[in-house]
């Protein structure tokens, strides 16, 4: 009831109250069974970007590695800004009767803010600077920000986008040039895994309650793919940065190994997306198609 305002669930509400502009009022589209448990996990897993990262141990890196790291951190921060702004658009639309979802989204915003903070700090901590913001990244993220449906946004951002980011963060952790970078992305990946779990629970529950949603989610993926039809690969500055991080240098044999590592990363991302889409409730055949349509920008 939009006339119950901010009354907690179970409270007795006097009649005659004003109508509130909550648009997310259908339980099946808002409150998945696991949300309360995920909120508790989120609260107990918060970490401090100042105290829990060993900033004093940031090393001096060779210039090519420093530049590559700055570029990677720039890309991560830019995408995490989108992951901050998109859920924020929906938080105030959630009816307070489903406060568990609102509370979880609040922890997600806190997580993303912390990630943005540490990624940008790491870009500068070794004497480097943020890198290039690619036009293709900007186009991809705008298409997320323009998504108006809560479940569609959850599927595009969380299941597909943040799910793909898990593999990117794991790759950067494996090839991190120092322990500080590895610790940053390890902690961020743990948070992102929780976000993906929430997204999967949300979409899976909504699909179980509304089979017609399968077609609408597929249509959302196809619309976004059409909007980004000219985006055929990850941004070149990011591809170069990941290659150099994996290569640990810029000599030709090392760069060749770095290229192969990035190629394997893209394959891993595709296969992992398929598994997550299947977990959400789609068939393997549908999942293969939807994964193939996902933005090369990763998020």
Protein language model regions, located:
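Terminal targeting/low-complexity segments that flank the catalytic cores of oxidoreductases
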Residues: 1-102, 124-130, 148-152, 209-299
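Short, glycine/acidic-rich beta->alpha junctions
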Residues: 97, 101-104, 111, 177
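Short hydrophobic/aromatic-rich motifs at helix boundaries and adjacent loops
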Residues: 56-63, 91-92, 112-113, 138-144, ...
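An internal, amphipathic alpha-helical element
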Residues: 166-175, 182, 194-212, 218-237
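Active-site-proximal alpha-helical scaffolds that flank and shape metal-associated catalytic sites
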Residues: 121-193, 223
């Amino acid at each position: 009831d939009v006339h119950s305002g901010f009354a907690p669930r179970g409270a007795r509400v006097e009649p005659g109250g004003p109508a509130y502009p909550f648009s997310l009022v259908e339980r099946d589209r808002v409150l998945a069974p696991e949300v309360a448990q995920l909120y508790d996990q989120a609260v107990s897993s918060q970490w401090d970007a100042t105290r829990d990262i060993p900033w004093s141990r940031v090393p001096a890196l060779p210039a090519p590695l420093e530049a590559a790291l700055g570029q990677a951190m720039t890309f991560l921060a830019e995408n995490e800004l989108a992951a901050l702004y998109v859920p924020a658009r929906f938080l105030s639309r959630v009816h307070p009767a489903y406060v568990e979802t609102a509370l979880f989204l609040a922890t997600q915003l806190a997580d993303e803010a912390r990630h943005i903070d540490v990624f940008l700090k790491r870009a500068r901590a070794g004497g480097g600077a943020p890198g290039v913001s690619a036009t293709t990244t900007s186009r991809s993220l705008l298409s997320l920000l323009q998504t108006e449906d809560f479940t569609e946004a959850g599927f595009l951002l969380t299941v597909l986008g943040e799910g793909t980011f898990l593999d990117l963060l794991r790759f950067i952790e494996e090839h991190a040039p120092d322990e500080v970078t590895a610790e940053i992305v390890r902690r961020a990946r743990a948070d992102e895994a929780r976000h993906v779990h929430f997204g999967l629970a949300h979409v899976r529950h909504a699909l179980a309650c509304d089979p017609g949603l399968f077609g609408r989610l597929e249509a959302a993926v196809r619309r976004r793919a059409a909007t980004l039809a000219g985006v055929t690969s990850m941004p070149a500055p990011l591809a170069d940065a990941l290659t150099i991080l994996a290569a640990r240098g810029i000599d030709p044999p090392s760069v060749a190994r770095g290229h192969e590592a990035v190629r394997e990363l893209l394959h891993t991302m595709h296969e992992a997306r398929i598994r997550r889409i299947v977990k959400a409730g789609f068939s393997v055949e549908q999942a293969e198609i939807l994964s193939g349509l996902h933005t090369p920008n990763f998020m």
